[in-house]
């Protein structure tokens, strides 16, 4: 499951729920 979160103007892709 690939989740893309927009943080600080940067797309952060979390595939393993890291962070």
From Swiss-Prot:
Purpose: The electron transfer flavoprotein serves as a specific electron acceptor for other dehydrogenases. It transfers the electrons to the main respiratory chain via ETF-ubiquinone oxidoreductase (ETF dehydrogenase).
Cofactor note (record): Binds 1 FAD per dimer.
Cofactor(s) of this protein: FAD
Record family assignment: Belongs to the ETF alpha-subunit/FixB family.
Annotated S-S bridges: none
Protein name: Electron transfer flavoprotein subunit alpha
Source species of the chain: Clostridium pasteurianum
UniProt entry tagged with the keyword Repeat: no
Keywords: Electron transport, FAD, Flavoprotein, Transport
Domain of life of the native organism: Bacteria
Quaternary structure annotation from Swiss-Prot or TrEMBL: Heterodimer of an alpha and a beta subunit.
